[in-house]
């Protein structure tokens, strides 16, 4: 008798995706982040659902409803901090997942990669709107500053901003719609994740060598299920340490003050995971130019398949491009640091140099190094 998991219409989809899926035998721990992101998404949806049961999306009561969750709801403080720090965990895994894709040339799976870029934008939008909901000082001013960037769009900018605000400033209407979008987007993300996996399973996974692994596949279960469980345990341990010992480490103290439109905080800055993009935005003196650079800093990922010049897929055997890659990583850390600093000397010039090098490495230096490496190998294939 054939096993039910191979015949049942629903179970066989799960079987082909997580049990009998042929996977390359040599994928390293860098391939764990997909499953970790799935766990992060589930944690965020569940904690978010319980928070939404007690939260009110009204300017008069939003801040106090979050206080009520932390003080009066059973384990409300735990749910709230799991949700807030879960977002940070989500972005840590996201950046590592994207970094893995860049290093090993996974972007050559065009459909999977492009859905991934859309997912990144969707997660960033969700996180931004979620940061507005507690209605603290940084929530209000962050929302004001970031939505105001749209006014840089010629002709329709001002109208567009007022349409998004639902008035002439960030107010009750803005908070209500941000809550609605923040609630619905994770489910759209979950649907996109399924499409992401669908396209991935059409081609099969990449592997560290970047070579074809058709000749040597192993079943996903038990080999990679047990490996994923180890990754999940490590991530959850890290998350719980963060939540139980340092819950406010990654937050902004200003957000413990209720939103006040009459009092601007000394340094308006987003959450840590947006600081690199914020630094790029601020490094350009022109408003429209800054907005374009901000969007391009993420959208540039969609160009990677077209910027790949090497005959090798992975960076595993390409020392010059490897060096450039790690310089890029260091550069992103510098941008993240600059994004959290005030706009004054020497931070302005450091931010501008880091922004120029960010785009230069991806658009110019990496494609050139790919050609040089091929020439050095005398590959005339």
Curated annotation (Swiss-Prot):
GO terms for cellular component: mitochondrial inner membrane; respiratory chain complex III. Heme b b566 binds at residues 97, 196. Keywords: Electron transport, Heme, Iron, Membrane, Metal-binding, Mitochondrion, Mitochondrion inner membrane, Respiratory chain, Transmembrane, Transmembrane helix, Transport, Ubiquinone. A ubiquinone binds at residue 201. The chain crosses the membrane at residues 33-53, 77-98, 113-133, 178-198, 226-246, 288-308, 320-340, 347-367. Binds 2 heme b groups non-covalently. InterPro entries: Cyt_b/b6_C, Cyt_b/b6_C_sf, Cyt_b/b6_N, Cytb/b6-like_sf, Cytochrome_b, Cytochrome_b_C_euk/bac, Cytochrome_b_N_euk/bac, Di-haem_cyt_TM. PROSITE patterns: CYTB_CTER, CYTB_NTER. It is a multi-pass membrane protein. Belongs to the cytochrome b family. Component of the ubiquinol-cytochrome c reductase complex (complex III or cytochrome b-c1 complex) that is part of the mitochondrial respiratory chain. The b-c1 complex mediates electron transfer from ubiquinol to cytochrome c. Contributes to the generation of a proton gradient across the mitochondrial membrane that is then used for ATP synthesis. Heme 1 (or BL or b562) is low-potential and absorbs at about 562 nm, and heme 2 (or BH or b566) is high-potential and absorbs at about 566 nm. This is Cytochrome b. It comes from Apodemus flavicollis. The gene is MT-CYB.
